Regions:
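FNR-like FAD-binding dehydrogenase module
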Residues: 1-399
Length: 399
């Protein structure tokens, strides 16, 4: 674990060690029978959120109302308000352009863990909201009949038939279950583009069904939904402004070139500047105008010109990458494209004395520009780095 030398000179020894400990704690990941959990620090934060919400919902009595017919059970009320409060955070942590990244500098892909696990916490809290809504009429019917279970079941069936919130709630639970299942790594890898398409559709349907399910006059529940919609619009507008700036109200023109082993090199000139290791989203209007695909930039920006050349290496697997490869194979080497980004990127490495860059296969596309940037800075005396170990593991040597 390395701390930049320039920071080490400024920090006391104890603070330096504490900083190194925090970094080591963050990078560590627990594995349970092949299931990789989030990094330790996000895991602690998510566990704290889960425990706090669970204790707040389940730790207060009573769970059900007594003596007041058709009154909502307190357990369901607490769980419902908690679930609504989670929704704006879940949506904003899953957006590329979000206020959390702007305020903290944390790139949006590092917030995805809160987006994914926040949805799982939401599902758990939503189940705690739904179950008492069914149990309450059962208890009311049983109590009013002197303890007859059949009367309780009848009252529960009547509540289900006469209350439209049960139907909308069931739809919401089904949608939320599918959102969580389809977001698992296995399903994402099957067909990423289809995953993105259906994820957007199902999420919009989920948010739209929340409005009729929530009572607009009860505990200001719609305020959370309005906040969520506002954050979504703000994210879209931010990306639109960024896209207009990157593309100058026109499309860039990418050049395609086939390489060995199903690889395609995408090259395009642009005026935007980026940091080594960052990535961009490319939208090809003549292929799939409604979809954009992330690609890591393998080059570094020019320091002596207003324009730079972005080069991308894409392996043809399926979807857009296969279409690009086939297009280049047919001799169609030029294609218009919209640029969205750049996003992400590692921390500044110029303060480290010894740097180890590890890559596997096409993962080298992230580390190669870091290597180029460090070498250039070493030549210009702009870095503390004295030694770079570059390790690239591949299945076979290219012909």
């Amino acid at each position: 674990m390395f701390i930049p030398r320039e920071k080490k000179r400024q920090l006391p020894s104890s603070l330096f060690k504490f900083s190194a400990f925090c970094r080591g704690l963050h990078y560590h990941c627990f594995r349970i029978k092949g299931w990789q959990l989030p990094h330790t620090v996000p895991l602690i934060m998510l566990a704290t959120l889960f425990v706090w919400m669970t204790v707040w919902v389940l730790g207060t009595l009573p769970y059900y109302s007594h003596g007041f017919k058709n009154e909502k059970p307190p357990l369901a009320t607490r769980a419902g308000s908690s679930a609504l409060a989670l929704i704006p955070f879940i949506f904003t942590s899953g957006s590329r352009f979000n206020p959390i990244s702007l305020a903290t500098g944390i790139s949006h892909e590092k917030l995805q863990v809160f987006h994914q696990y926040g949805a799982r916490i939401l599902l758990f809290i939503s189940v705690l909201h739904g179950i008492p809504m069914l149990v309450q009429p059962y208890l009311d019917g049983k109590r009013s009949s002197g303890g007859d279970p059949a009367a309780g079941r009848t009252a529960m069936q009547e509540a289900w038939d006469n209350n439209p919130h049960f139907e909308s709630g069931t739809v919401l639970i089904v949608l939320l279950v599918w959102i969580n299942i389809s977001s698992m790594r296995f399903f994402r890898r099957l067909h990423y583009e289809f995953f993105v398409f259906q994820h957007v559709i199902i999420t919009v349907a989920f948010l739209a069904n929340l409005f009729p399910h929530s009572n607009v006059t009860y505990m200001d529940s719609w305020n959370y939904l309005f906040a969520t919609v506002a954050l979504i619009i703000w994210s879209w507008l931010g990306r639109l402004v960024l896209s207009i700036y990157c593309n100058k109200l026109s499309t860039a023109h990418a050049q395609l070139e086939n390489l060995n082993e199903g690889m395609t090199r995408i090259s395009l000139k642009t005026h935007i500047k980026w940091k080594p290791g960052q990535y961009i989203y490319l939208r090809f209007p003549f292929l799939k105008v409604l979809q954009s695909h992330p690609f890591t930039i393998t080059t570094i920006p020019s320091t002596d010109s207003d324009t730079s050349v972005i080069q991308i290496l894409a392996r043809a697997k399926g979807g857009i990458t296969r279409k690009l490869y086939d297009r280049a194979k047919q001799g169609k080497t030029h294609i218009p494209v919209f640029i969205d980004g750049p996003y992400g990127g590692p921390n500044n490495l110029k303060g480290y004395k010894h740097i180890l860059l590890l890559s596997g296969g096409t993962g080298v596309t992230c580390n190669f520009p870091l290597l180029l940037d460090l070498v250039r800075k070493m030549e210009n005396g702009e870095t503390e780095c004295e030694l770079i170990d570059f390790v690239w593991s591949v299945r076979s040597r290219s012909k």
